[in-house]
Amino acid sequence: MKTDWVLGLDIGGTHIRAGKFDSEYRLEDFRISSSPSLLGRGEDPIGALAAYIRAYCVDHSEAGLPRAISIGFPSTLNKEKTMLLSTPNLPGLNVLSVTEPLEKKLALPVFINRDVNLLLLNDLHVHHLEQAEIVIGCYFGTGLGNSIRINGSFLNGAHGVAGELGHIPLAGG
């Protein structure tokens, strides 16, 4: 049974964060895990991610299945937002089709985006800035990333990384 929540995942170079989001964007059942231990070996990252998602859903089975899964990656994506092209801090996630194989394994819709775009969307909502004409978000984690939104649309550029400051590893990140 699908219910009115979305499973959100933030795949970072150090941690994977997961949680249930309801229709009011409230976060519940937050979980944090190690990215390198789950995805770092690169042997079957889609299988590992599918197993992680299934385990999360089993742990929260009283909520039923999510309506969809939304995943943010610290990556360059293809224009269709179905494939990871480059993920410097997680080498096993380079040139990797994500949405189609995960949808087949999980029988749920899967959406991916750059993690910084999803972080900026959250900040726009939390700070009531949805109508702002130009917004730039800079985010620090394992690396440094940024997102630019102009007139309600993300600035992606020809290769999906317009304005990107780069995947710069930070000491202690």
Regions found by a protein language model. Give the residues of each.
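Conserved phosphate-binding loops in N-terminal lobes of ATP-dependent enzymes
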Residues: 3, 7-73, 80
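Glycine/GP-enriched mid-protein hinge/lid loop-to-helix segment characteristic of carbohydrate kinases
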Residues: 3-7, 19-21, 28-32, 39-42, ...
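Residue-level signal for pocket-adjacent positions within structured domains
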Residues: 28, 72, 79, 85-88, ...
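Glycine-rich phosphate-binding loop and adjoining helix at the ATP-binding site
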Residues: 36, 41-50, 64-69, 76-134
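Short, small-residue-rich loop/turn micro-motifs
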Residues: 73-75, 172
